[in-house]
Amino acid sequence: MRNLSGGHVEEFVLVGFPTTPPLQLLLFVLFFAIYLLTLLENALIVFTIWLAPSLHRPMYFFLGHLSFLELWYINVTIPRLLAAFLTQDGRVSYVGCMTQLYFFIALACTECVLLAVMAYDRYLAICGPLLYPSLMPSSLATRLAAASWGSGFFSSMMKLLFISQLSYCGPNIINHFFCDISPLLNLTCSDKEQAELVDFLLALVMILLPLLAVVSSYTAIIAAILRIPTSRGRHKAFSTCAAHLAVVVIYYSSTLFTYARPRAMYTFNHNKIISVLYTIIVPFFNPAIYCLRNKEVKEAFRKTVMGRCHYPRDVQD
């Protein structure tokens, strides 16, 4: 189980979801189906937005970035989990664990900031539709998207610098289905106070501040919706915003509960279950909430992606 060299753990063992073999098989089928559907949904959205000129606007530009992010996000955790279900082997090397941790934190932080940017974009579009083209030009949208990715990967690098300097002398059992920061901090034999403080502060900055921006934007959006004169218009706008807000609340609340509260490392079983929400469930529902219910996206998908699929047959006929 452990391979120690000079007092340093060279591999970790991920506990995952220890259950009976029949339930393991059921979980494998469930997560594998979610994984494939998530890949398909997000890939179709990325290609649709890329191929359709009618969607080359800031709103869909951000949606494309979100779907592209989800493609990487779900690949950080689920493939290793699926392999563990099949092989019953949860071992992961030290380097592999740190690599998974880095990309997971980077993509999670990027999503937090990107969701805030998307909420701000919707605020500008709904509360100032006449000024929206000048307030959100494509150049600003590009800079905001780049800032989202840059801040996410930079904050992850800062966390990893502190985590990688800690010593791991054993045990090497991680009570999680992927390499997360809290169980790793619990395994270290070094003084972890500074690393815990950095982790907590960065979690507050990268999760709480974007959440406040989202809440502020949607508060203004709801106030604008209430001023819509027709009940049909209000109902349509509310149904769209409620779906978006539900995803945002689930994602931010679960990440805040896991990372931005003191002594989070002592509730591994709860954290492991909650982690399923923002690592598997939210990426699965995001495309349906943000894009697949959107008439413009569906129409663009029909004309571009489906049209290209049928084009060779039309030529042959």
Swiss-Prot record:
It comes from the Eukaryota. Keywords: Cell membrane, Disulfide bond, G-protein coupled receptor, Glycoprotein, Membrane, Olfaction, Receptor, Sensory transduction, Transducer, Transmembrane, Transmembrane helix. GO terms for molecular function: G protein-coupled receptor activity; olfactory receptor activity. Residues 47-54, 121-139, 218-237, 293-317 are cytoplasmic. Glycans are attached at N3, N186. Pfam families: 7tm_4. Disulfide bonds join C97-C189. It is found in: Cell membrane. Residues 1-25, 76-99, 161-197, 259-271 are extracellular. GO terms for cellular component: plasma membrane. GO terms for biological process: detection of chemical stimulus involved in sensory perception of smell. SUPFAM superfamilies: Family A G protein-coupled receptor-like. Signal peptide: none annotated. The chain crosses the membrane at residues 26-46, 55-75, 100-120, 140-160, 198-217, 238-258, 272-292. It is a multi-pass membrane protein. InterPro entries: GPCR_Rhodpsn (IPR000276), GPCR_Rhodpsn_7TM (IPR017452), Olfact_rcpt (IPR000725), Olfactory_GPCR1 (IPR050939). Belongs to the G-protein coupled receptor 1 family. Odorant receptor. This is Olfactory receptor 6P1. The gene is OR6P1.
